[in-house]
Amino acid sequence: MNKKRPNGKSHSTRPVRSGAPKWVRFTREEVELLVEELAKKGYSPSMIGIILRDQYGIPLVKQITGKKLTKILEEKGLAPKIPEDLFNLIRKAANVRRHLFEHPKDKRAKKGLEEIESKIRRLADYYKRIGKLPKEWKYEPEKAELLASGAAS
């Protein structure tokens, strides 16, 4: 079954570049230390990328270090247990479920929850296949409430 809506195409394209830009003054080791410090402060991988871009002038970690940001976090043992995109979907589903508890006749929200949970299952299957999630991992809405509330990230 196809997705209900196609993904948007409106965004800027990254320039094709093999190495780090000339104007970046950080070395590979300095960038890895910055990533580690920000992760220890509790920032998510996407937030770390935004902070590095906006405050330190580092456009892409991979151009400087040769490794993706999540790979650096995995090497340091700071990677999240559940991939960030899956965790965000779980949190979104928990919020919609909470809304439905207060407004049980909201049919649009019910349909939206079905779509979100379908997306969670598809993404979980992918992460199980590539080995980022254990094979026995299963999405359960009750446990998702605990995850989304910040019990584990």
From Swiss-Prot:
Keywords: Ribonucleoprotein, Ribosomal protein. The keyword Ribonucleoprotein applies. CDD domains: Ribosomal_S15p_S13e. Residues 1-14 have a biased composition (Basic residues). Residues 1-20 are annotated as: Disordered. GO terms for molecular function: small ribosomal subunit rRNA binding; structural constituent of ribosome. One of its GO terms (cellular component) is cytosolic small ribosomal subunit. The keyword Ligase does not apply. InterPro entries: Ribosomal_uS15, Ribosomal_uS15_arc_euk, Ribosomal_uS15_N, uS15_NS1_RNA-bd_sf. GO terms for biological process: translation. It comes from the Archaea. Part of the 30S ribosomal subunit. NCBIfam families: PRK08561.1. Belongs to the universal ribosomal protein uS15 family. This is Small ribosomal subunit protein uS15. The lineage of its organism: Archaea, Thermoproteota, Thermoprotei, Sulfolobales, Sulfolobaceae.
